[in-house]
Amino acid sequence: MHATTLTDAEYLRLSGEMLARIEATIDRWLQDDVVDIDGQRTGGLLELSLPGGSKIVVNTQPPQHELWLATRGGGHHFKYVDGAWRDTRDGAEFLLRLSQAASTQAGKPLAF
């Protein structure tokens, strides 16, 4: 697995698009009464508050060109590889890992 070489501008665009996609999904879930998740974004950090009081944090890491995901199950680092954000440990795709964590923490199936 070789990370795609990104310029700083490309990284900021791609990471920003991912945060916006997560926010749009949460907004849709709230509108459709799927699940009550609160998303709070401050710059490159997005904190999701889930039912039961648990949290998931997505954080951009510009110096490393990574996305970091912190869940109740642990932390993961993601690099952009061949058109997708991939876990640096096992190559899992970011949205899959986020969906798994959100489903576990919300107690219902959720897919970003």
Language-model-detected regions and their locations in the chain:
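N-terminal intrinsically disordered, cationic/polar leader segments
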Residues: 2-57, 61-112
